[in-house]
Amino acid sequence: MSNIIKQIEQEQLKQNVPSFRPGDTLEVKVWVVEGSKRRLQAFEGVVIAIRHRGLHSAFTLRKISNGVGVERVFQTHSPIIDSITVKRKGAVRKAKLYYLRERSGKSARIKERLGN
């Protein structure tokens, strides 16, 4: 029984997901349905958390929009995600960057990771 579930989940995994880590800045293009129209909407932010659970993997992006912090959780293998682009690689030493919620301005900056 579990082999059937694993096989079905394996078929639904996306193959074109780039590798990224917490601290990286991503641009995620998402399909949005408004009435009868479908359009792409971009969300660019810093990865503050990643949840590795196979087909149920997710990541959280945070950005500041008009002075207000906005966080959005994306399911990594969701069909509404059109593309994920890594814009900038950040150098951090923690897996969860929840401390960025309390910071603003220059203290919320993340150094750029050079090299790999």
Curated annotation (Swiss-Prot):
<dbReference type="GO" id="GO:0006412">
    <property type="term" value="P:translation"/>
</dbReference>
<dbReference type="InterPro" id="IPR001857">
    <property type="entry name" value="Ribosomal_bL19"/>
</dbReference>
<protein>
    <recommendedName>
        <fullName>Large ribosomal subunit protein bL19</fullName>
    </recommendedName>
</protein>
<dbReference type="InterPro" id="IPR008991">
    <property type="entry name" value="Translation_prot_SH3-like_sf"/>
</dbReference>
<dbReference type="Pfam" id="PF01245">
    <property type="entry name" value="Ribosomal_L19"/>
</dbReference>
<comment type="function">
    <text>This protein is located at the 30S-50S ribosomal subunit interface and may play a role in the structure and function of the aminoacyl-tRNA binding site.</text>
</comment>
<dbReference type="GO" id="GO:0022625">
    <property type="term" value="C:cytosolic large ribosomal subunit"/>
</dbReference>
<keyword id="KW-0689">Ribosomal protein</keyword>
<dbReference type="InterPro" id="IPR038657">
    <property type="entry name" value="Ribosomal_bL19_sf"/>
</dbReference>
<dbReference type="GO" id="GO:0003735">
    <property type="term" value="F:structural constituent of ribosome"/>
</dbReference>
<comment type="similarity">
    <text>Belongs to the bacterial ribosomal protein bL19 family.</text>
</comment>
<dbReference type="InterPro" id="IPR018257">
    <property type="entry name" value="Ribosomal_bL19_CS"/>
</dbReference>
<keyword id="KW-0687">Ribonucleoprotein</keyword>
